[in-house]
Amino acid sequence: MNRIKNIAFSALLAVGSFSAVFYTSCNKDECKDVVCQNLGTCVSGICNCAIGYEGTSCETESRTKFIKTWNANDQIGATNLVYTVSVGNGTNVTNVIISNAFSDDFFSNTINATVDGNTITIPDQQPDGSTSNFRVSGTGTYSAGRINWTYTITRIFPAENKVHTGVWQ
């Protein structure tokens, strides 16, 4: 009886071992040959990029497409603002600086913005300092070499909001 138990146990152990080898040989590491840059991580053979990076291997800063001199065409009601404005690198990979030419030289100082993928956001700020009577905030979306903007310039006192829309190319 002991001998039958030993044979049955050995057979079961052999089948289990063969099954484990067969299973692991069929499950290849999809990330084995994938190299993700800039702290990206590989999941199922595809790089998941860290914030601020994009591309197949996370090789490109997301803000790169925004960094240039743009020809701007903004509208506020019946008024058309046509001007040139530059966007440059900010302090980290998600930040950019918009030159003071923004909104046809409305502000004396630069404007800080953040980039997340194809979206550029101007968080609410007073570019000309706390003694200035004006604030700005807004969002733009990048597509096919253009940024479509909606931004608001707010006069603090007396209170008034001016919503601008525009296309930069």
Q: Where are the regions that the model predicts?
A:
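Beta-sheet ligand-binding and adhesion/scaffold domains
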Residues: 73-77, 114-169
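Short domain-boundary/entry signatures in modular proteins, especially
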Residues: 27-31, 58-67
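Disulfide-braced loops of extracellular cysteine-rich modules
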Residues: 29-39
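Sec-dependent bacterial lipoprotein signal peptides
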Residues: 1-26
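Extracellular cysteine-rich, disulfide-stabilized repeat modules
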Residues: 40-51
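Tryptophan-anchored aromatic micro-motifs
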Residues: 62-82, 98-99
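Short, exposed beta-strand/loop patches in secreted or surface proteins that constitute
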Residues: 39-42, 83-91, 109-117, 137-144
